[in-house]
Amino acid sequence: MDYTSEIAELLSRRGFRRFMMSRTQVGHLLLAGHLDDRPIDIVLDTGASKTLVELTYCRSEGIAVTDTGQVGHGGSVYTLGDARLTLEGLPVRTDGIFAIDMSSTNQRLVSKGIDPIRAVIGQDALRYHQAVIDYATLALFLKEQPA
């Protein structure tokens, strides 16, 4: 018996919105979103503690970043300040949007003919929005009014 539609209906009644995902060639779950007014593909990463954007992408798009003085993922960590990340118009609540250099990861992806990662939704957003991931239908459910 297929319970996926019942799950979706229950979550909808409880104030969740459904966002459809796709899989990349290496299995990453991918969402379509916006960073301010720019369309951007976003990888859902349950292992990432924070939501982030690739530093080279920020620089190529003229997105202002500020060095936090912290080090992570092999380099400096930057913040995007008041940048706004949205999924189908829903503002994604985070602990702040950070930027890191993901060039080593992206070089490996590109060498395999796979698009580079531009942004990642991490555990901060998933926690605030009480995320439910339905792997059977590749759907992400986020509570519209975050906790």
Please identify what each model-predicted range represents:
Residues M1-A147:
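Pepsin/retropepsin-fold aspartyl endopeptidases
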